[in-house]
């Protein structure tokens, strides 16, 4: 990634991808709300089988929503790292000019010019350090997101409670639906691993 223009192109592409992931996250969030509304209507009609199907759909959309947000967050962290590297390359290129300016100021005894040059140089590195700290915080924060494991039964009960509805048919124990939730979590982990590999390949390109 020694070519600055190529690096900037990669940064632009990753930012675009991150925005696309965020749009997909919003879409999934909207679809989750639609499915929860269908749960409400099905419960009102006493259609518990239908309510269960809609609840499963809502949970799947919620999981997809969180996965998209997680991927977008991780991409943003990669972009921050690449952006920092790009700025370091710019500083590296200007290093020769700064050293030359300092030598000139020292030779002529112009302490004011030397001080101004150092102020400018140090300011660039302060900005770099702030950005690096922000990037590290984003990287750490992205790992705190976890895939929801809300059970179908609890979601149905939540919708019923929100709308003051009585669940006319007894709901089975949540344990009966633990396996689908586990599969959703396993799928999320697989997607995380894939996204990490894609980000690494793109960063090396």
UniProtKB/Swiss-Prot annotation:
The lineage of its organism: Eukaryota, Viridiplantae, Streptophyta, Embryophyta, Tracheophyta. GO terms for cellular component: ESCRT III complex; multivesicular body. It is a peripheral membrane protein. The keyword Mitochondrion does not apply. Involved in ESCRT-dependent multivesicular body (MVB) formation and sorting of endosomal cargo proteins into MVBs. The keyword Coiled coil applies. Signal peptide: none annotated. Residues 13-51, 109-140 form a coiled coil. This is ESCRT-related protein CHMP1. It is found in: Cytoplasm; Endosome membrane. InterPro entries: Snf7_fam (IPR005024). One of its GO terms (biological process) is late endosome to vacuole transport. Pfam families: Snf7. Keywords: Coiled coil, Cytoplasm, Endosome, Membrane, Protein transport, Transport. It comes from Oryza sativa subsp. japonica. Belongs to the SNF7 family.
